């Protein structure tokens, strides 16, 4: 494995770590606001989701003056607010209840957020394992060269 490919592996996996960290923060924010009936914007909290996009690296090759594109990792494209309707829950006496006793609650399912959190955690761990494997291979290669 050459130095360029080693750095590429670290860059790609590092971008995955950063993206999954942001995703986990967004999920934690969703869980923390699962019962927030009032936000500064007005109305209940809206669930947020992370949208990823792939990053392309442009590389120049001697035989190809125009260069080539190859995958170079992932980045957070944007954080989207859900357009799903709010949950209406019957809670008479709640300060935000309408005349019939219903309160608009955030469109957050804590169970789904926990599933997403496990998925994000596993992706984070996979990227970390790739980085650790790459470092281990490089250390072994250096020890072979040093003998």
Label for each model-derived stretch:
Residues 1-147:
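Amphipathic alpha-helical polymerization modules
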């Amino acid at each position: 494995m050459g130095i360029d490919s080693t750095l590429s592996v670290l860059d790609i996996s590092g971008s995955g770590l950063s993206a999954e960290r942001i995703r986990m923060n967004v999920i934690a924010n969703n869980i923390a606001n699962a019962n927030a009936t009032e936000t500064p914007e007005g109305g209940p909290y809206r669930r947020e989701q992370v949208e990823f996009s792939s990053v392309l690296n442009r590389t120049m090759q001697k035989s190809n003056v125009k260069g080539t594109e190859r995958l170079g990792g992932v980045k957070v494209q944007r954080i989207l607010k859900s357009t799903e309707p709010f949950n209406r829950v019957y809670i008479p006496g709640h300060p935000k209840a309408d005349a019939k006793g219903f309160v608009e609650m955030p469109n957050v399912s804590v169970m789904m957020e926990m599933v997403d959190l496990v998925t994000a955690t596993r992706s984070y761990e996979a990227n970390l394992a790739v980085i650790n494997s790459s470092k281990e291979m490089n250390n072994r290669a250096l020890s072979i060269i040093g003998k």
